[in-house]
């Protein structure tokens, strides 16, 4: 039986996760030119400045009408059996603090993603086919629209999945249901904590044994 994480454990998980994300970061706020993969999804007006806390939730449930980007039609729809394999990329600084397609605010440090057609917000399992790492991510934005990529993930997700440096990875994406409008991410955090690769990483954190 799976035992729910207590609030203190959730807080500790957040600290450990922050430490892991911080490891390997450059000293500059932005990555070196050319290092950050770009999405052709249009960016909205920035409403949260760099360094300021990004509120969770605040958006609405949205499926949307068919739309066209660069001559290609996309048809949003409920798709409970969605299970696709393809190339993932990530987006970060250029979109951080801006509104997503359903009215939330993109946080590059959150476990989130953008998808061309799945309902917003929804949950998906994303597995890196090269290293086997899997995350549960909140889909709250539209995109990507580059080279038939199947999903754009946040910078944090790309780092956890192990492809931040390279920029893209072959992944499997599976629909996991609707996400709460409140932005509650405890389900994603619990799934992360349950992964063996993540627990190994925690065991190597500088203060893991304290």
Residue ranges and their predicted role:
Residues 2-4, 25-210:
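Secreted/periplasmic proteins
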Residues 1-13:
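Bacterial N-terminal signal peptides that target proteins for export
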Residues 21-22:
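Bacterial Sec-type N-terminal signal peptides, specifically the leucine/valine-rich hydrophobic h-region
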């Amino acid at each position: 039986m799976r035992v729910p994480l207590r609030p203190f454990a959730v807080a500790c998980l957040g600290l450990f996760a922050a430490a892991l994300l911080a490891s390997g970061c450059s000293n500059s706020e932005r990555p070196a030119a050319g290092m950050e993969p770009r999405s052709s999804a249009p960016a909205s007006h920035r409403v949260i400045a760099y360094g300021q806390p990004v509120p969770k939730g605040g958006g609405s449930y949205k499926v949307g009408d068919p739309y066209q980007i660069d001559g290609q039609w996309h048809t949003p729809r409920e798709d409970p059996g969605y299970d696709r394999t393809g190339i993932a990329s990530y987006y970060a600084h250029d979109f951080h603090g801006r509104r997503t397609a359903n009215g939330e605010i993109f946080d590059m440090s959150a476990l989130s993603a953008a998808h061309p057609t799945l309902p917003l917000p929804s949950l998906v399992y994303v597995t890196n086919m090269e290293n086997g790492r899997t995350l549960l991510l909140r889909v709250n934005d539209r995109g990507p629209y580059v080279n038939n990529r199947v999903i754009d993930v946040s910078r944090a997700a790309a780092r956890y999945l192990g492809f931040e440096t390279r920029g893209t990875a072959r992944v499997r994406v599976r629909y996991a249901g609707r996400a709460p409008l409140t932005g509650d991410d405890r389900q994603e955090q619990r799934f992360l904590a349950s992964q063996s690769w993540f627990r190994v990483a925690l065991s190597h954190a500088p203060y893991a044994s304290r």
